[in-house]
Amino acid sequence: MDPPLVNDSSFSAANPSSYTLSEIWPFPVNDAVRSGLRLAVNSGRVFTRSEHSGNKDVSAAEESTVTDLTAGWGSRKTRDLNSEDDSSKMVSSSSSGNELKESGDKKRKLCGSESGNGDGSMRPEGETSSGGGGSKATEQKNKPEPPKDYIHVRARRGQATDRHSLAERARREKISEKMTALQDIIPGCNKIIGKALVLDEIINYIQSLQRQVEFLSMKLEVVNSGASTGPTIGVFPSGDLGTLPIDVHRTIYEQQEANETRVSQPEWLHMQVDGNFNRTT
């Protein structure tokens, strides 16, 4: 068999003062990495002192140093990730805080505009820019409504709401309006209370007017008949004819008939005389 290439006696004790940490690890070193390197150096010292330990102990020491180094590097990565997460959280929290502030400012502006509309001190931007919007709205409100084709009747409790009953109520309302107009025309009718009494008063007043019209028509007939007759009636003035009694009218008519007979009688006698004379001859 060939002799082993490497013997335990060929390894010499390592001198830690002959090298530095910056030469071995050029990257920035954390506390975990330093602790791992220290463990590695200490394990090397233990390895040099123990001459009877085998290759298994050397491999175990190497594995421990590697695990320590990887653990330090992983802790650094986790710290970097944690710092990134914290920074992202801070940014998100600051952005959310700014959004909340902006939304709060908008709400305050809206609330202030709504509360200021009543006093006129604060107005929204649309009204301030338009200027005449408020006046147009007031003009539209002040415009009279167009006449409606239908009749609005308010139904009370217990009243029917069908078309027939609504039309009947509308008819009664029109009648009441006409009665109020007649009350204003007829003297003393405003003092009467009750529709029945008002109707009686209106009927009595209309009947009295009808009688007066009939009497005046009779007067006109008498005046017209007197104007068509001879000058005998001209002795009486026209204004006094209406006040004369009925007997006077009869005497006037009898005188007229007598005058007509007097005028017509000699003509009739003359005709008879002429006829007799002709026969005798």
Swiss-Prot record:
SMART domains: HLH
Keywords for the protein's UniProt record, in alphabetical order: DNA-binding, Nucleus, Transcription, Transcription regulation
Biased composition regions of type Basic and acidic residues, renumbered to the chain: 77-88, 138-152
GO biological process: regulation of DNA-templated transcription
Compartments (UniProt record): Nucleus
Keyword DNA-binding annotated: yes
Chain residue ranges for the region called Disordered: 47-167
One of the record's GO molecular function terms: protein dimerization activity
Protein name (Swiss-Prot/TrEMBL): Transcription factor bHLH79
Organism: Arabidopsis thaliana (Mouse-ear cress)
